[in-house]
């Protein structure tokens, strides 16, 4: 790869628009906070910024595919995952607004505005990750994504659990990043270049132990961020301690971005999957599927349950990653989209049920007993989400799972498929358990509840939209499939 001076033209700027708009929004929000604290204004600015960033994807895709410096590759693949990250962030922002008080008038003790700023910064990191094609781009994106999340997790600092979760995540995340960097150093020592493509080329000539170790260590760093099995221990604690909208962000936007970059690495340099690394990934996938589902059986806390189930879901995604032929890239795109939808819905219901003033979120299962008799529509939303996570037909989750299984069959990964089917069967059980709880006749206990008019607020409207989408995509998935097909073709064509 000959190094030439980077010409930076208007086209490059257009290609970078989503990222630039997101960063500009962060700056605007920061200045607005500095000028005058106003929760509603901050919320509106953030939503505007994220919507503009989503819209700016259109002109950006117009000039794609385009290599912007050696670090970023803006193409349809990047565009698709950028859209997912931005949409997830947008949903988390509306949830944050509902969570931090909205119109309920009860003031959140402390400053509310910075949370929006952190979400914007983190989203910018996600955008960098989705388009990274270089180890440095990957690392910058990863840090920009995860550093603001430390603050977000500990945002309800007057709540001991939240603070503990933030510190725990920060320490473990640093360890994960250290592994990642070490792996990168080993790769660079061997390949002499940090671009994914160059690494792939030098790997194709023959793999040495150094390279395999380097990739293995990088995988450890990324597996930590995706909470795959041996590195999953932080997940339930952090999900439980973090404020509900932040848990939603962690489960959706941050994981999608990391998975996108992992997929890109695998697509561009297939040699990274060679040898014992493939077996290692297979083991991690099987372990994630089984552990995630089995540990979720024991949970009496909805957020912890969702944490464990997200471990299992990323185990399923690894199956498609290992298959990484034909269908697999599309399968991953579809699965991530449906997973984001359903996770946002599930965490959204928890968000609307909780207020940060009552000391902790409404995440214990008993708080949802008989919810149907008090908030029927909210219950309907949560029920659809649980069905979708379990992968029941007529919901979006089924389409994703179906595609992943199809990809696995295509690549003939029978062991992995066995684990998937077993895991899904266990999964149905604990999702049903949540649903049964919702419809129980309840003893009259006083506890916190979603406000009566939740459906007329930003957060509630977003939830209803998500529920309808989850159902609609389950019945008529064609639009999503076409989108993903376009994005996947580009990834394979390179």
UniProtKB/Swiss-Prot annotation:
It is an enzyme of class 7 (translocase). Keywords: Cell inner membrane, Cell membrane, Membrane, NAD, Quinone, Translocase, Transmembrane, Transmembrane helix, Transport, Ubiquinone. InterPro entries: NADH-Q_OxRdtase_suN/2, ND/Mrp_TM. GO terms for molecular function: NADH dehydrogenase (ubiquinone) activity; NADH:ubiquinone reductase (non-electrogenic) activity; quinone binding. It is a multi-pass membrane protein. Its EC number is 7.1.1.-. It catalyses: a quinone + NADH + 5 H(+)(in) = a quinol + NAD(+) + 4 H(+)(out). It is found in: Cell inner membrane. GO terms for biological process: ATP synthesis coupled electron transport. It holds the Pfam family Proton_antipo_M. The keyword Cytoplasm does not apply. The keyword Coiled coil does not apply. The chain crosses the membrane at residues 13-33, 43-63, 82-102, 117-137, 138-158, 169-189, 209-229, 243-263, 277-297, 311-331, 332-352, 380-400, 412-432, 461-481. GO terms for cellular component: plasma membrane. It comes from the Bacteria. NDH-1 is composed of 13 different subunits. Subunits NuoA, H, J, K, L, M, N constitute the membrane sector of the complex. Belongs to the complex I subunit 2 family. PANTHER family: NADH DEHYDROGENASE. NDH-1 shuttles electrons from NADH, via FMN and iron-sulfur (Fe-S) centers, to quinones in the respiratory chain. The immediate electron acceptor for the enzyme in this species is believed to be ubiquinone. Couples the redox reaction to proton translocation (for every two electrons transferred, four hydrogen ions are translocated across the cytoplasmic membrane), and thus conserves the redox energy in a proton gradient. This is NADH-quinone oxidoreductase subunit N. It comes from Ectopseudomonas mendocina (strain ymp) (Pseudomonas mendocina).
């Amino acid at each position: 790869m000959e190094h030439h001076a980077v010409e930076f033209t208007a086209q490059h700027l257009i290609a970078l628009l989503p990222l630039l708009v997101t960063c500009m929004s962060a700056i605007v929000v920061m200045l607005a906070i500095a000028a005058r604290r106003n929760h509603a204004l901050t919320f509106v600015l953030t939503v505007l910024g994220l919507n503009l960033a989503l819209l700016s994807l259109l002109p950006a895709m117009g000039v794609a595919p385009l290599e912007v410096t050696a670090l970023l590759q803006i193409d349809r693949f990047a565009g698709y995952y950028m859209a997912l990250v931005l949409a997830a962030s947008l949903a988390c922002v509306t949830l944050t607004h509902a969570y931090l008080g909205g119109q309920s008038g009860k003031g959140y003790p402390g400053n509310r505005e910075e949370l929006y700023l952190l979400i914007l910064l983190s989203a910018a990191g996600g955008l960098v990750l989705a388009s990274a094609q270089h180890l440095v781009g990957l690392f910058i994106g990863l840090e920009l994504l995860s550093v603001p999340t430390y603050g977000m997790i500990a945002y309800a600092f007057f709540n001991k659990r939240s603070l503990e979760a933030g510190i725990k995540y920060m320490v473990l995340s640093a360890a994960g990043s250290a592994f990642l960097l070490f792996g990168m150093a080993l790769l660079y020592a061997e390949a002499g270049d940090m671009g994914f493509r160059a690494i792939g080329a030098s790997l194709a000539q023959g793999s040495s132990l150094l390279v395999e170790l380097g990739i293995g260590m990088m995988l450890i760093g990324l597996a930590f961020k995706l909470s795959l099995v041996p590195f999953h221990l932080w997940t339930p604690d952090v999900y439980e301690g973090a404020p509900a909208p932040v848990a939603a962000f962690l489960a959706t936007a941050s994981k999608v971005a990391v998975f996108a970059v992992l997929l890109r690495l695998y697509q561009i340099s297939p040699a990274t999957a060679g040898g014992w690394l493939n077996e290692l990934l297979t083991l991690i996938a099987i372990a994630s599927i089984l552990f995630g589902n089995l540990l979720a059986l024991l949970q009496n806390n909805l957020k912890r349950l969702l944490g464990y189930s997200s471990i299992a879901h990323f185990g399923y995604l690894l199956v498609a990653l290992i298959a990484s032929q034909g269908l697999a890239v599309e399968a991953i795109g579809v699965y991530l989209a449906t997973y984001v939808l359903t996770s946002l819905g599930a965490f959204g219901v928890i968000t609307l049920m909780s207020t940060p003033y009552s000391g902790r979120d409404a995440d214990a299962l008993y708080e949802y007993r008989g919810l149907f008799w008090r908030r029927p529509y909210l219950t309907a939303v949560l029920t659809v989400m649980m069905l979708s996570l379990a992968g029941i037909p007529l919901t979006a989750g089924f389409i994703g799972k179906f595609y992943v299984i199809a990809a696995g069959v295509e690549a003939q990964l029978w062991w992995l498929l066995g684990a998937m089917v077993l895991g899904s069967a266990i999964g149905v059980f604990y999702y049903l358990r949540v649903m049964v709880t919702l419809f129980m006749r309840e003893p009259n206990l006083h506890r916190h509840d979603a406000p009566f008019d939740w459906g007329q607020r930003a957060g509630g409207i977003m939830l209803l939209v998500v529920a309808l989408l989850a159902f609609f995509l389950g019945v008529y998935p064609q639009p999503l499939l076409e989108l993903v097909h376009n994005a996947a073709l580009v990834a394979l064509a390179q």
